Amino acid sequence: MTNAFPFSVQESVPLNRFSTFRIGGPARYFKELVSVDEALKVFSFLHTSPIPYIIIGKGSNCLFHDQGFNGLVLYNNIQGQTFLSDTQIKVLSGVSFSLLGRQLSSKGFSGLEFAVGIPGTVGGAVFMNAGTALANTASSLVSVEIIDHAGNLLSLSREELLFSYRTSPFQKKTAFIVSATFQLTRDSQAAQRAKALIEERILKQPYEYPSVGCIFRNPEGVSAGALIDQAGLKGLTIGGGQISQKHGNFIINTGNASAADVLELIETIQKTLKQQGIALEKEVRIIPFQPNLGVS
C-alpha cells in the first residue's frame, strides 16, 4: 500500500517513541519531514488524497491510542534558524522550543525565556500558544509561515492571527506551520531569568516520569492543578498511569501505562470536578485510532 504515496513512507512505526508520554501503538504509515521543499510536495499530494493524516513534533502534547493511528503520521523534523535583524529571528518549526529559549537567553536575548522547559517544537508552541503565567508564544511572535490546505506557502502577520490562552487559529484549520519569526530584545538578565524558570519547573513538576505536561487548561482565575489537589485526587493510580503527587495537573506514566489508563484518569478527574460545578477542558490532544472520529 506504500505505493499509494509519491514519496517514501514507513509502515507500522511505534508511536510511543514519538510521545513524551511513551504511550501509543503503531502508525499505519509514517513520514519524517526534514525540509520545507519536502513538506510542500507532501501537502500538495495530501490536498487531493483521501488518506487521513496528523502532524506531530516532539509529541509533548499528544496521547496516542493504544492501537496507534490508522492513517499517515507526519513527523516534523525541519530544522534551522536565521537572524533577520539584530533582534528578530526566523525559526523553522521542527526546532526544539526549549532549546531555542535556552540558546537565545544564554546569548543575552530576551523574549523566549519562558520556553525553557517546554518540551515541544516551535511549531507545536505556535499551535498551542504554549506559555507560562508570565508569557506565551504569541507575546513575541511577529509572523508565521504556513502551508495551507491547498499546499500553498503563505506568510501571516501576528495581526492577522487571533491567539488566546493555549489557543491559536491553527487548532481549527488545516495548515502546516513551517516557521515562526520572533521579536527579541537585548537583556543581560535573560539567562538568569531562564535559569530561575527551569529551576522552578523542576521543583514543581514531575520531570522524572514520562508525561505530556498539563492535562487540562486552567479555568479563568484558578489553577486546574490546585482544583485537582483540593478534590483529593493526587496520587490516584489506574494501571501504569498516576495523577502526580507533585502536580495535580500532570498524569505520569509510572512504567507501563496505556492510553486507556490515562483516559480513565482524565474522565475520573472531569467527573469529580463536574460534581463541584467545575468543567475542566483538556489541553492534551487525544489522537484516536480511527481518524474519522476526529481529534479532541
Curated annotation (Swiss-Prot):
<dbReference type="GO" id="GO:0051301">
    <property type="term" value="P:cell division"/>
</dbReference>
<keyword id="KW-0573">Peptidoglycan synthesis</keyword>
<dbReference type="GO" id="GO:0009252">
    <property type="term" value="P:peptidoglycan biosynthetic process"/>
</dbReference>
<feature type="domain" description="FAD-binding PCMH-type">
    <location>
        <begin position="22"/>
        <end position="187"/>
    </location>
</feature>
<keyword id="KW-0132">Cell division</keyword>
<dbReference type="InterPro" id="IPR011601">
    <property type="entry name" value="MurB_C"/>
</dbReference>
<keyword id="KW-0131">Cell cycle</keyword>
<protein>
    <recommendedName>
        <fullName>UDP-N-acetylenolpyruvoylglucosamine reductase</fullName>
        <ecNumber>1.3.1.98</ecNumber>
    </recommendedName>
</protein>
<keyword id="KW-0560">Oxidoreductase</keyword>
<keyword id="KW-0521">NADP</keyword>
<dbReference type="Pfam" id="PF01565">
    <property type="entry name" value="FAD_binding_4"/>
</dbReference>
<keyword id="KW-0961">Cell wall biogenesis/degradation</keyword>
<keyword id="KW-0133">Cell shape</keyword>
<dbReference type="GO" id="GO:0008360">
    <property type="term" value="P:regulation of cell shape"/>
</dbReference>
<feature type="active site">
    <location>
        <position position="166"/>
    </location>
</feature>
<feature type="active site">
    <location>
        <position position="283"/>
    </location>
</feature>
<dbReference type="InterPro" id="IPR016167">
    <property type="entry name" value="FAD-bd_PCMH_sub1"/>
</dbReference>
<comment type="function">
    <text>Cell wall formation.</text>
</comment>
<dbReference type="InterPro" id="IPR036318">
    <property type="entry name" value="FAD-bd_PCMH-like_sf"/>
</dbReference>
<dbReference type="InterPro" id="IPR016166">
    <property type="entry name" value="FAD-bd_PCMH"/>
</dbReference>
<keyword id="KW-0285">Flavoprotein</keyword>
<feature type="active site" description="Proton donor">
    <location>
        <position position="214"/>
    </location>
</feature>
<keyword id="KW-0963">Cytoplasm</keyword>
<dbReference type="GO" id="GO:0008762">
    <property type="term" value="F:UDP-N-acetylmuramate dehydrogenase activity"/>
</dbReference>
<comment type="pathway">
    <text>Cell wall biogenesis; peptidoglycan biosynthesis.</text>
</comment>
<dbReference type="InterPro" id="IPR003170">
    <property type="entry name" value="MurB"/>
</dbReference>
<dbReference type="GO" id="GO:0005829">
    <property type="term" value="C:cytosol"/>
</dbReference>
<dbReference type="GO" id="GO:0071949">
    <property type="term" value="F:FAD binding"/>
</dbReference>
<comment type="similarity">
    <text>Belongs to the MurB family.</text>
</comment>
<dbReference type="InterPro" id="IPR016169">
    <property type="entry name" value="FAD-bd_PCMH_sub2"/>
</dbReference>
<dbReference type="GO" id="GO:0071555">
    <property type="term" value="P:cell wall organization"/>
</dbReference>
<dbReference type="Pfam" id="PF02873">
    <property type="entry name" value="MurB_C"/>
</dbReference>
<dbReference type="InterPro" id="IPR036635">
    <property type="entry name" value="MurB_C_sf"/>
</dbReference>
<keyword id="KW-0274">FAD</keyword>
<dbReference type="InterPro" id="IPR006094">
    <property type="entry name" value="Oxid_FAD_bind_N"/>
</dbReference>
